């Protein structure tokens, strides 16, 4: 099965021969290698590039272990270049090579080679893009399958695809399995033996139980504000473990750097400033999150919120979670100052959207809860509520856009309704 990744392929096409190193980043097993070695290579061949002018090296393979040595890898590439015609280097999982930035910088000085690399650790790569390549590194972030990509490859209708996606997520390999047990075992296996193992080895962690437990806590708390102090207290009260705030903060950073989770900052809308303390964390793939909890804690509301968050990132938006303070009456009828939560504050250039995500908004109480947050925002940027189901978008009497999840996910310009 060939899954189309047209948006990412187009990003590579428009960067071809631009004199920069194209650095494709993202969580392992999200399809970076397939994009580079299958889809992009196919495009190069169809564009008239000879096969012997495409140099392919997968550094995570045992067959290329000796090429993890920077001098040997550089010489191997030079030896493969037999003439002055253009060559295309496809280098997979570059973080396996020590001093990889020296090799790539040396290749930049060769006029007839166009370089594409993939990597699975953001800190390891992103900092070097800025400092080592001096403006000549071009990063392309790849995610697991969006729902639209998943649905296009799925053998079934929307309802079945949506149920499957909410449980097993969008890692491409999941679509290859027809049996649910295989999907579950695959996700649980790679979480432990690929992702956690990578984090432990890369950061030289000695206590695997700590990072394991931290992942479990974060998986149980997607969409809920938390911070290292709260997590530390959970360790003490439930596990009897002293786990310092600093260590927790470092370990969370390791998970973010491995693209396992994303961190959403809290933004005070009226105060126009970021506020510290409680942040929200979301999993890059909800299937991995569910696998971590052995598929017990489904929580469709929070899973749906996680999927919306990921979709917004895929579309290139900057996404924060919002708070807005306003006066409101409490249960006793007294007017008090209250803090309202806005699920997402979404920015791209001069555009801004405020988004609430509601799995079910049929009751009047739930409608009031979701809409009050939007009502108290004192500006005119677009305000939307995304609800579960297939509802077509419409505007209510207050000008808020209400749309179903299906429309949001399957229409790339859905926020422009």
Predicted stretch roles:
Residues 2, 148-325:
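Interdomain hinge/linker elements that couple catalytic modules in large macromolecular machines
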Residues 2, 25, 34, 45, ...:
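A cross-kingdom feature that marks ATP-driven nucleic-acid transaction machinery
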Residues 31:
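Conserved glycine(s) of the Walker
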Residues 35, 39:
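Hydrophobic positions on the alpha1 helix immediately C-terminal to the Walker A/P-loop
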Residues 55-85:
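Short glycine-rich substrate-engagement loop in P-loop NTPases that contacts/grips substrate
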Residues 114-120, 141:
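Structural recognition of the conserved hydrophobic beta-strand(s) that form the central parallel beta-sheet
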Residues 123-138, 153-155:
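Short regulatory helix/loop adjacent to the ATP-binding pocket of P-loop NTPases
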């Amino acid at each position: 099965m060939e899954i189309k990744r047209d948006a990412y392929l187009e990003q590579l096409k428009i960067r071809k021969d631009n004199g920069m190193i194209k650095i494709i980043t993202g969580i392992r097993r999200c399809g970076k290698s397939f994009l580079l070695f299958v889809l992009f290579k196919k495009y190069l061949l169809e564009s008239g590039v000879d096969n012997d002018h495409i140099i392919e090296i997968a550094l995570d393979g045992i067959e290329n272990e000796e090429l993890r040595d920077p001098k040997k890898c550089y010489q191997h590439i030079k030896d493969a270049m037999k003439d002055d015609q253009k060559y295309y280097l496809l280098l997979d999982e570059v973080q396996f090579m020590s001093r990889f930035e020296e090799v790539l910088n040396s290749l930049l000085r060769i006029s007839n080679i166009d370089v594409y690399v993939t990597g699975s650790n953001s800190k390891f790569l992103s900092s070097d893009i800025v400092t080592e390549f001096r403006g000549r590194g071009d990063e392309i972030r790849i995610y697991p399958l969006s729902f639209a990509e998943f649905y296009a490859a799925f053998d079934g209708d929307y309802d079945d695809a949506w149920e499957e996606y909410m449980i097993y997520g969008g890692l491409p390999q999941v679509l290859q399995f027809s049996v649910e047990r295989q999907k579950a075992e695959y996700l649980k296996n790679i979480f432990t033996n690929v992702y956690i193992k990578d984090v432990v080895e890369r950061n030289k962690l000695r206590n695997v139980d700590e990072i394991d437990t931290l992942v479990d806590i974060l998986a149980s708390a997607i969409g809920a504000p938390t911070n290292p102090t709260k997590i530390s207290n959970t360790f003490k009260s439930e596990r009897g473990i002293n786990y310092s705030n600093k260590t927790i903060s470092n370990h969370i950073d390791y998970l973010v750097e491995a693209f396992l989770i994303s961190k959403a900052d809290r933004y005070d809308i009226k105060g126009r400033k970021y506020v510290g303390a409680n942040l929200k964390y979301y999993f890059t793939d909800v299937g991995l999150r569910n696998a971590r909890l052995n598929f017990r804690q489904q929580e469709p509301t929070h899973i749906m919120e996680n999927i919306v968050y990921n979709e917004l990132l895929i579309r290139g938006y900057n996404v924060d979670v919002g708070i807005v303070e306003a006066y409101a009456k409490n249960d006793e009828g007294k007017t008090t100052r209250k803090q309202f939560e806005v699920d997402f504050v979404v920015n791209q250039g001069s555009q801004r959207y405020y988004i609430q995500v509601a799995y079910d908004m049929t009751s009047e109480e739930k409608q009031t809860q979701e809409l009050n947050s939007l009502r108290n925002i004192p500006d005119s940027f677009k305000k939307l509520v995304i609800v579960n189901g297939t509802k077509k978008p419409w505007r209510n009497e207050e000008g808020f856009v209400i749309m179903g999840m299906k429309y949001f996910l399957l229409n790339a310009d859905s926020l422009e309704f």
